[in-house]
Structure formats: C-alpha cells, structure tokens
Amino acid sequence: MKQIFIGIIRFYQKFISPMTPPTCRFYPTCSHYGLEAFQTHGALKGFWLTLKRILKCHPFHPGGFDPVPDKKDDK
C-alpha cells in the first residue's frame, strides 16, 4: 500500500510538478514531505500526515520549516 502512494507522489514530481510554478510555502515541499512521511511511518500514518500538511498549504498559513515527525513520536 505504501508503495502505491509513493508511486503517485513520484509521478506527480516527475510529470505534473515541472509544468506548474513553484508555490509550496513549506520546506521540505509538500511532495517531499509526503514521500518522507510514507517512508518513515507507513501507509496509514503517512497518509494522515501528508493530508494534514496539504490542508495547511494555503495563503493564510505562514509556511516555513515543517519536518516529518520522528518515528519515535508514534506512541
């Protein structure tokens, strides 16, 4: 399951993202955040973290540095 989400993000990064202007207000970008979240936390928590991050990506949020939480914080 995790590999399917990672494949979707990589497809977006390779084929869709280059055709759009850079607009992400966060570092790392939302797609890189999603990759790291899925690789670190697996499919369910990775999906939840990525969804929360994408919902924060709007003009009224200041953005900035927002790393994926460490695996030890899963408890």
Swiss-Prot record:
Coiled coil: none annotated. It is a peripheral membrane protein. Pfam families: YidD. The keyword Membrane applies. One of its GO terms (cellular component) is plasma membrane. Keywords: Cell membrane, Membrane. The keyword Membrane applies. It is found in: Cell membrane. InterPro entries: Membr_insert_effic_factor_YidD. Belongs to the UPF0161 family. Could be involved in insertion of integral membrane proteins into the membrane. This is Putative membrane protein insertion efficiency factor.
